[in-house]
Amino acid sequence: MMPYISKNAVIIGRDRKFITDNVTVEEPLQISIENENRIYNVSVIMRTPVDDEALATGFLVNEGIIEPDKIIKVSKRSENNVCVSVESFNEDLLKNRNFYVNSSCGVCGKTDIENVFIKSHGIVRSQSRTDHSIILGLPDKMMKNQKIFSYTGGIHAAALFDLNGNMISISEDIGRHNAVDKTIGKMILKNVYRMEDSILQVSGRAGFEILQKASMFGVSIVSSVSAPSSLAIDVAETFNITLISFVRKNRMNIYSHPERIL
């Protein structure tokens, strides 16, 4: 399935024009777990249909439902169904969550926000630093690699960089939290389970769910082009993550642990 399709539109300005416009596809994805020959339907996620295996992997790990080293295989059983076979999983956590996730909300189904803090792998220990000029250059680097955005102008992105500003992984999705799950999921599928000396750059704002997912992967710096939320700042403070927002060409705001930025 293509991540974008053409739709008819009408432009109204000085003259009425009929055009064909590219729009980002939003479709449901069923995510399942297979364990001991039994299938568990975990979640239906509204997403853009690209990198589905990475999305399912990142979602399940970032939600604390599975541990990355327990994954046996990830398979796409149909166009809108991905199944992750695992040695074991967190059955209690699965029972305590209503897993319908729309493309704009990654935390909507959680019955207790405190549960999100419980499943983290601990605070980030890395004290490695990077120069502010590297942070300022990340949004443009990410934008140049946003292939779907160049066609539709309506899709989020998330990218992992090393502390020298080299891109490691990038993903796009109509949901910003999905883009993060995809980006982290790609690394997990390469058997990389934690990256403390890394920067997560996201389009849009830095909400709670973005910081929660970053903490699960051990990311030390999160950078966003728009505003943070109060709870995102709280998570960053708690897990020793440097949170930077309003990143522009010559300025940025640092909301937590500024000592990592030179």
Curated annotation (Swiss-Prot):
It holds the Pfam family FdhD-NarQ. One of its GO terms (cellular component) is cytoplasm. InterPro entries: Cytidine_deaminase-like, FdhD. The active site is at C105 (cysteine persulfide intermediate). The keyword Translocase does not apply. Keywords: Cytoplasm, Molybdenum cofactor biosynthesis. It is found in: Cytoplasm. Mo-bis(molybdopterin guanine dinucleotide) binds at F246, V247, R248, K249, N250, R251. GO terms for molecular function: sulfur carrier activity; sulfurtransferase activity. Its main location: cytoplasm. GO terms for biological process: Mo-molybdopterin cofactor biosynthetic process. Belongs to the FdhD family. Required for formate dehydrogenase (FDH) activity. Acts as a sulfur carrier protein that transfers sulfur from IscS to the molybdenum cofactor prior to its insertion into FDH. This is Sulfur carrier protein FdhD. It comes from Picrophilus torridus (strain ATCC 700027 / DSM 9790 / JCM 10055 / NBRC 100828 / KAW 2/3). The gene is fdhD.
